[in-house]
A protein has these predicted regions:
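Non-transmembrane, aqueous-exposed alpha-helical and coiled segments at domain scale
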Residues: 1-166
Length: 166
């Protein structure tokens, strides 16, 4: 399998290539990340909070939904891209300058993973502590609350984190 093969083109700052190529394959396998019409493998990477904050801002979002939390089950460590470096300079905000973006390296915050199966979990407090910590910190990094988290592929494998949606 070619680590550069992808269903879509474009710059993925946190694609798990090189030293993290194996990790990207695990995420792809666990998340069934293959193109529907072609069956080609999609590139997978850690959550990019820089791009996430930018998306939240330009779309005027006041809350988000996290999907595929179950894909992270079994990983010893989980990373979130919290910034970039470019020519030794720290970048905290997303840039739409394609040249600069293509030269950036991700800066990660690392979390402990969890081993417990979460697909049957129905509440935030039923999640493993490390999964709770991950969701809590994502909300802090993104500066918006997470209202819903999916813990599996089925409709009922969803946790409502905000009572307004319960």
């Amino acid at each position: 399998e070619n680590p550069d093969e992808s269903v879509t083109e474009g710059d993925l700052k946190n694609a798990n290539n090189g030293d993290e190529y194996y990790q990207g394959r695990v995420l792809r396998k666990n998340g069934y990340e293959y193109g529907t019409p072609t069956g080609r493998a999609r590139r997978c990477g850690w959550f990019d909070a820089v791009a996430g904050r930018y998306s939240i801002t330009i779309n005027g979002l006041d809350a988000i939904i996290i999907t595929k939390l179950d894909v992270l089950t079994g990983l010893k460590k989980i990373k979130v891209c919290i910034g970039y470096t470019h020519n030794g300079q720290s970048i905290k905000d997303f840039t739409n300058d394609i040249k600069i973006l293509s030269e950036c390296k991700p800066v990660y915050e690392e979390f402990d993973g969890w081993e417990e199966e979460i697909r049957n979990v129905k509440s935030y407090h039923g999640l493993p502590k490390n999964a709770q910590n991950y969701l809590r910190r994502l909300g802090e990094i993104l500066s918006v609350p997470i209202y819903i988290a999916s813990v599996g592929a089925e409709r009922d494998e969803t946790i409502i984190l905000d009572e307004r949606f319960g």
